[in-house]
Amino acid sequence: MSKPTGSTSGCLDILNVKSSRILDIPCKVCGDRSSGKHYGVYACDGCSGFFKRSIRRNRIYLCKSGSQGGCPVDKTHRNQCRACRLKKCLEVNMNKDAVQHERGPRTSTIRKQVALYFRGHKEVNGSSTHFPGSSLPGPPFFTTVTQLEPHNLEMSSVATTPERQAIVGLAQPTPKYPHEVSGTPMYLYEVATESVCESAARLLFMSIKWAKSVPAFSTLPLSDQLILLEDAWRELFVLGIAQWAIPVDSTTLLAVSGLNSENMEAQRMNKIMAEIQALQEVVTRFRQMRLDATEFACLKCIVTFKAVPTQGSAELRAFRNASAIAALQDEAQLTLNSYIHTRYPTQPCRFGKLLLLLPALRSVSPSTIEEVFFKKNIGNVPITRLLSDMYKSSDI
């Protein structure tokens, strides 16, 4: 498979991490296996990346325990206290000047946004790149959920067609936060620009992985798959924010984006502020409904399988198999309706309320989401281009 040219070439490189990069020499900071010398010492990718970000952004951390260097810094505990981790980096003689004189990140590096995902999982699980949903299609949802919930849900009666079975099978229990992987809890969810940026990158990545995990989706023509994904990514992203409780307060988001009245014209700034408020409102409405994993999975299918694209020219974006797409959306709605009647029999209006919430997912423009969550890291590269390149990669 030929690699894309230009600024997208790095995207596939990040996805093709070779085990030969992992050495038997331990990381001087945490003791994990190093991937070579970084800033003068042998270090793992996690610690070298942490050191680079800390120095480049002039981070000042406070020790969580107040011991000023007494917190353990090893493979298991390295994420618990950033102050002690940075102190350990300096103690083992990581070179700050090497970071400052290093060539800065290029705005064309799409791979940085993808790397955020992998770095986050290395931080939690060592070198593992597994994340929720990677084993899909797995056991049917009704089998999994009966082992976790006190209610015995007869979901087998809902999944009466292959399409519905595929949709129901998507609703594997998912972590509360993108940082929480394979049962390993995130130590503290810190409302910091780094946390939000990495979470946004993971949401984008998992939207792609999720789409490729849907059997009915992958049977559509590739051109239809790409149109659907490019059209629905905004709604999938907002649903992910609601599902995983990512902070959307204006102070945090403006810090994430680096936007302010000094570097942006007033009219554009006012539009972004209005859309941040709209994002807060729609996320609040979804969280008030307290959706479970199955409902989120069905809603993702409903917003993805739109037979008429909501973005762009209909002439330029005509589907090759619009009837199949429409049928899949019908199946997703029927599945959600049947599930709600089974799971929430005392809430007869719940299905209608959830459907009425879906248009609100489009109250935030794709351009604002790109500007706030991604532009600082990937520059002017369109998200749709990133989505297309990543989706076509055989490594995902």
Swiss-Prot record:
<comment type="subunit">
    <text>Monomer.</text>
</comment>
<comment type="function">
    <text>Orphan receptor that binds DNA as a monomer to hormone response elements (HRE) containing an extended core motif half-site sequence 5'-AAGGTCA-3' in which the 5' flanking nucleotides participate in determining receptor specificity. May be involved in the regulation of early eye development.</text>
</comment>
<keyword id="KW-0675">Receptor</keyword>
<feature type="zinc finger region" description="NR C4-type">
    <location>
        <begin position="27"/>
        <end position="47"/>
    </location>
</feature>
<dbReference type="InterPro" id="IPR013088">
    <property type="entry name" value="Znf_NHR/GATA"/>
</dbReference>
<keyword id="KW-0238">DNA-binding</keyword>
<keyword id="KW-0804">Transcription</keyword>
<dbReference type="InterPro" id="IPR035500">
    <property type="entry name" value="NHR-like_dom_sf"/>
</dbReference>
<feature type="zinc finger region" description="NR C4-type">
    <location>
        <begin position="63"/>
        <end position="89"/>
    </location>
</feature>
<keyword id="KW-0539">Nucleus</keyword>
<dbReference type="InterPro" id="IPR001723">
    <property type="entry name" value="Nuclear_hrmn_rcpt"/>
</dbReference>
<dbReference type="Pfam" id="PF00104">
    <property type="entry name" value="Hormone_recep"/>
</dbReference>
<dbReference type="GO" id="GO:0008270">
    <property type="term" value="F:zinc ion binding"/>
</dbReference>
<feature type="DNA-binding region" description="Nuclear receptor">
    <location>
        <begin position="24"/>
        <end position="101"/>
    </location>
</feature>
<keyword id="KW-0217">Developmental protein</keyword>
<dbReference type="InterPro" id="IPR050274">
    <property type="entry name" value="Nuclear_hormone_rcpt_NR2"/>
</dbReference>
<comment type="similarity">
    <text>Belongs to the nuclear hormone receptor family. NR2 subfamily.</text>
</comment>
<dbReference type="Pfam" id="PF00105">
    <property type="entry name" value="zf-C4"/>
</dbReference>
<dbReference type="GO" id="GO:0005634">
    <property type="term" value="C:nucleus"/>
</dbReference>
<dbReference type="InterPro" id="IPR000536">
    <property type="entry name" value="Nucl_hrmn_rcpt_lig-bd"/>
</dbReference>
<keyword id="KW-0479">Metal-binding</keyword>
<keyword id="KW-0863">Zinc-finger</keyword>
<dbReference type="GO" id="GO:0000978">
    <property type="term" value="F:RNA polymerase II cis-regulatory region sequence-specific DNA binding"/>
</dbReference>
<dbReference type="GO" id="GO:0004879">
    <property type="term" value="F:nuclear receptor activity"/>
</dbReference>
<dbReference type="InterPro" id="IPR001628">
    <property type="entry name" value="Znf_hrmn_rcpt"/>
</dbReference>
<dbReference type="GO" id="GO:0000122">
    <property type="term" value="P:negative regulation of transcription by RNA polymerase II"/>
</dbReference>
<dbReference type="GO" id="GO:0030154">
    <property type="term" value="P:cell differentiation"/>
</dbReference>
<protein>
    <recommendedName>
        <fullName>Nuclear receptor subfamily 2 group E member 1</fullName>
    </recommendedName>
</protein>
<keyword id="KW-0862">Zinc</keyword>
<keyword id="KW-0805">Transcription regulation</keyword>
<feature type="domain" description="NR LBD">
    <location>
        <begin position="153"/>
        <end position="394"/>
    </location>
</feature>
